[in-house]
Amino acid sequence: MLKELRPAIVILVALTIITGLIYPLAMTGAAQVLFPYQAQGSLIEQGGKTIGSALIGQSFTADRYFHGRPSATTAPDPKDASKTVPAPYNAVNSMGSNLGPTSKALADRLRQDVATLKAQNPSAAVPVDLVTASGSGLDPDISPQAARFQVPRVAKARNLPEAEVETLIDSRTEGRDLGFLGEPRVNVLKLNLALDRMAASGQPR
């Protein structure tokens, strides 16, 4: 019996060592050497402190900053653990809204969000990504159109020329991956950090 089982046991042990130890360590080591920034989570630092990741969005609400997409993520209610409360961009609980196209709650939220945005920029059409949440609730990017829609509000709040803010958006716009995958996008956290630097120095960066 043991003789018949030995090949299976040897293969099991060998594959466990190869796929569970050697391969993960080799890939981790290669990533640390070839792509250290990405391997560490694409973390963004400022003043020696980690302030976020380029891969996970953050909730910006002040007029002086660009805002990301709506986020449907939640967190446990501190008053009642059996319930949840809205917690935008909660990376511990990635999720979408799960509201279907016929949902009244979704329609009401969309109408409210569109009205709020139109009040900020009445002459422009509201970009769809500014009123729709991503499937993960953690999308760090918005479209260039969504960024430009917010220029009047941001420029007014910071007392900056709109042309300079638009130039900053252009400099921070990333193209399609490999030239054909996805859509052009702007990372909201990186854009806001560049905006802070521009305001501090008086020059676009």
UniProtKB/Swiss-Prot annotation:
InterPro entries, sorted: KdpC
UniProtKB keywords: ATP-binding, Cell inner membrane, Cell membrane, Ion transport, Membrane, Nucleotide-binding, Potassium, Potassium transport, Transmembrane, Transmembrane helix, Transport
Principal location listed in the UniProt entry: membrane
Topology class, membrane: Single-pass membrane protein
GO cellular component, one term: plasma membrane
Keyword Zinc: no
Pfam families, A to Z: KdpC
Oxidoreductase keyword on record: no
Subcellular location: Cell inner membrane
Membrane-traversing stretches: 7-27
Gene Ontology terms for molecular function: ATP binding; P-type potassium transmembrane transporter activity
Purpose of the protein: Part of the high-affinity ATP-driven potassium transport (or Kdp) system, which catalyzes the hydrolysis of ATP coupled with the electrogenic transport of potassium into the cytoplasm. This subunit acts as a catalytic chaperone that increases the ATP-binding affinity of the ATP-hydrolyzing subunit KdpB by the formation of a transient KdpB/KdpC/ATP ternary complex.
Quaternary structure and partners: The system is composed of three essential subunits: KdpA, KdpB and KdpC.
Annotated family: Belongs to the KdpC family.
Protein name from the UniProt record: Potassium-transporting ATPase KdpC subunit
UniProt organism field: Nitrobacter hamburgensis (strain DSM 10229 / NCIMB 13809 / X14)
Gene: kdpC
